[in-house]
Regions:
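Glycine-rich Rossmann-fold phosphate-binding loop(s) that bind the pyrophosphate
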Residues: 59-62
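Glycine-rich FAD pyrophosphate-binding loop
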Residues: 72-99
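Conserved FAD-binding subdomain of flavin-dependent enzymes
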Residues: 103-143
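Helical element adjacent to the flavin cofactor pocket in flavoenzyme catalytic cores
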Residues: 235-326, 331, 357
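Active-site-proximal substrate-binding core of FAD-dependent oxidoreductases
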Residues: 556-586
């Protein structure tokens, strides 16, 4: 028997080794074929004569900037023939970040990168030079920094008593696990208009688990968010399921994403001759009559920079498009209508218009194939939350947080006060976090999901609070003395708050037809790229979504045959599945 068992094990080992060798051979063949296609495509693009063809990109966020980079790098399109229109005076869209030592610093959002699942992001930025490390790409710079500053949260969840919870267990009951498994196995099309709460209506315990609090605040889900998007997150981020309690999969950047990624990308585009028209809003599109989808003209509204009232400060213009020109539009923005407050001032009560969504709505009203923006931008009470960026003199504030969490700046990922009325979370990055940040100042960032609720200590809704009040609420959840809080508040330069009414709009429940295709059916020269277009299997609210959409738009309109980096199917890899199952059983 022992001899037979030995022979069986030997045969199994040989078969396994043969399988590994075969897989390597197949991978090598795939890479060789991909390299051959790239070489052919490059030769074709090098021989193209674009003449006077122009590319007009609407919106100055990551999607448009990535599209411009792909046009230049992969299509050999002249940078001087590319124009990016941005309605504000800052590029980067939702990836903004800036300020100064006098007024403090601010990031409206804080976007998570992940080494395993940002395939096109890393590929694009591998060709964008770093601004601070000559000879290195942005991708190399970020990943080198991240590997030197690993994340391992020691205080992922904190209860109402200020106790750091043991989150090694996900806290599931059997019914929770069955509902999760059933969701993963359900066809996405059957989840039209369903919320997460709808799906787990028979197991409300799910919303009390450690897993829910951690997954919710990592990705900014609400109970009323789309069940389909929640399902996508589970599939796309299954690699992270097994380590969600430590956030080891979070990829840290040397500075905020604006300074670490947007500024180098902007410099790359400027060096290539791309035109940026800031403070210039595209108010409408003119489509050619008849079948198909062809943009004929863009209607522009430029701020003339003069101190004038109303329409007197704007110049209206029309940009006619010729045969061969292309237009790529940012369809909706998560930070549309964002409002800022500061240490002593709450954000304004008056809502601002959703500029990007308005343009999308006008286009969709004429062409039904352009999706349904109303589905995403009509319920601010469901899609709004607030962030706050704290700037302090010295490191006393950060030391107090470090003493509580056990994490030095840059190592803790996200900390969530799970029982707080506003569901407050914060992250303390490695310092400095802004390019212009002085050595004697420190910053950290936080956000609250339940902004209409009355605070636990400050008895008013977060939406109505000043930066000072929000920080006081936060510090009291650390359960430190009033005397120490007073000392810490003396070091504060500013707390810039940001109300974002549409930030969770991509997670709104919707039908599978509500998001348009990147290049709509019948389009001759028009594409859309944003968090609101349809990218099968991809997860919204990520940098990868914007870059993948941009690459899809450019390659389709320009006839590029080089494959786009696919969504890596971690949810089909046995090792990843087993690790996730093991975590789910804890």
């Amino acid at each position: 028997m022992k001899g037979k068992a030995g022979k069986f094990l030997t045969a199994a080992a040989v078969a396994a080794a043969a399988g590994v060798v075969l897989k390597r051979m197949r991978d090598q063949q795939k890479e060789q074929e991909a390299s051959r296609i790239r070489s052919i495509e490059e030769a074709v693009m090098n021989n193209r004569d674009y003449g006077d063809r122009q590319a007009y990109l609407i919106g100055g966020g990551l999607a448009s900037m990535a599209a411009a980079a792909y046009l230049i790098r992969d299509c050999k399109f002249p940078g001087s023939h590319i124009t990016i229109y941005e309605s504000s005076d800052v590029l980067g869209g939702s990836n903004d970040g800036g300020g100064d030592s006098g007024k403090g610093f601010v990031c409206r959002g804080n976007h998570m990168l992940n080494e395993e699942t940002c395939e096109n992001f890393w590929e694009l930025f591998s060709s964008i030079p770093s601004l601070t490390n000559p000879g290195r790409s942005v991708t190399e710079e970020i990943l080198n920094f991240d590997h030197a500053h690993p994340t391992h949260a020691r205080a992922r969840l904190v209860n109402r008593d200020g106790k750091i919870l043991d989150v090694s267990s996900m806290g599931f009951h059997s019914q929770d696990r069955l509902a999760l498994l059933k969701l993963l196995l359900t066809d996405e099309k059957r989840l039209d208009n369903l919320t997460i709460q709808d799906w787990f209506k028979d197991t409300p315990h799910f919303f009390t688990t450690n897993f829910w609090y951690m997954w919710q605040t990592t990705f900014a889900f609400q109970k009323w968010s789309s069940a389909a998007e929640f399902r996508r997150s589970l599939n796309r981020m299954m690699f992270e399921f097994g380590r969600i309690e430590t956030l080891e999969g979070v990829t840290s950047t040397p500075l905020n994403l604006y300074d670490s990624a947007i500024r180098p990308l902007e410099e790359y585009l400027r060096q290539a001759g791309v035109h940026f028209e800031k403070n210039c809003r595209v108010t409408d599109l003119d489509f050619a009559p008849g079948p198909g989808l062809t943009v004929k003209a863009l209607y522009l509204k430029r701020d003339n920079g003069e101190q004038a009232e109303g329409e007197a400060r704007y110049i209206h213009d029309i940009r006619q498009m010729k045969d061969g020109d292309i237009c790529i539009m940012t369809a909706g923005s998560m930070t549309d209508g964002a409002l800022l407050g500061d240490l002593y001032t709450a954000v304004p009560g008056k809502e601002e218009p959703f500029i990007s969504a308005q343009l999308w709505s006008k286009a969709a009203a004429r062409h039904l194939e352009l999706g349904n923006p109303e589905r995403f931008f009509s319920k601010c009470h469901e899609t709004a939350w607030m962030s706050f960026t704290v700037t302090c003199r010295g490191d006393q504030m950060l030391k107090a947080i470090e003493n509580f969490t056990g994490n030095i700046p840059g190592s803790g990922g996200l900390m969530t006060f799970k029982d707080s009325a506003w569901l407050l979370s914060s992250t303390v990055p490695a310092q400095p976090y802004f390019a212009a940040q002085p050595k004697d100042e420190t910053c950290f960032w936080g956000y609250g999901l339940y902004i209409q609720a009355e605070g636990d200590y400050v008895k008013k809704p977060m939406r109505d609070c000043t930066g000072q009040e929000i920080l006081m609420e936060y510090l009291r959840h650390l359960h430190i003395s009033e005397e120490e809080i007073a000392q810490l508040m003396e070091t504060v330069v500013n707390v810039i708050t940001c109300y974002m009414p549409a930030v969770n709009a991509p997670f709104e429940p919707h039908r599978c037809t509500d998001r348009p295709q990147v290049v709509p059916a019948g389009s001759k020269n028009f594409a859309m790229a944003s968090q609101f277009v349809e990218l099968p299997k991809e997860l919204v609210f990520t940098e990868e979504y914007s870059v993948r959409a941009a690459r899809t738009a450019v390659y389709t309109l320009m006839g590029v045959n080089t494959p786009i980096c696919p969504v890596t199917p971690y949810n089909r890899r046995l090792k990843v599945i087993f690790r996730a199952l093991k975590k789910a059983m804890t």
